[in-house]
Amino acid sequence: MPELPEVARTAISLNTRIQGSDLLEVKIHSGRYSRHGNPVGMDRFIENLPAKIESVDFHGKLVIFTFNDSNDKRWWMWNTFGMSGGWKSEKSKHGHVELVTTNGSYFYTDIRNFGTIKFVDDEKATKAKIKSKGPDHLKDNNTDELFAQRIR
């Protein structure tokens, strides 16, 4: 299972590579989304491609892609890695979802198919999702005192 530092490193690496580029296409190759339908919100999202990739960030183990679509509307893609997920720049047997960008393609791989992807155009829902994950131990100012308060 990818741990917090691995998720953070992946988000930072993706942000370095694709921030500011255009997302041209989202392709489903295999896995849960090929069998059970596209990720929630994807059909509406892809209607307005290309979309500018504003950022790739993380909060805990949640990876958050922020886009600005061709109609100047903001979208977010929420991604969790599950037990075996991650992003690669080369297609592999388990490269289930492909993001085609002006800086190349990036593949979401997930051998066990426990990870999730969801497209959302609601900033309040995105903020609520982030808040529901609790403090981010790599970003938030976490002290021993705050930790003790949270567990009381």
Predicted regions and their residues:
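Extended, highly charged segments
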Residues: M1-H59, V63-R74, E90, V97-T102, ...
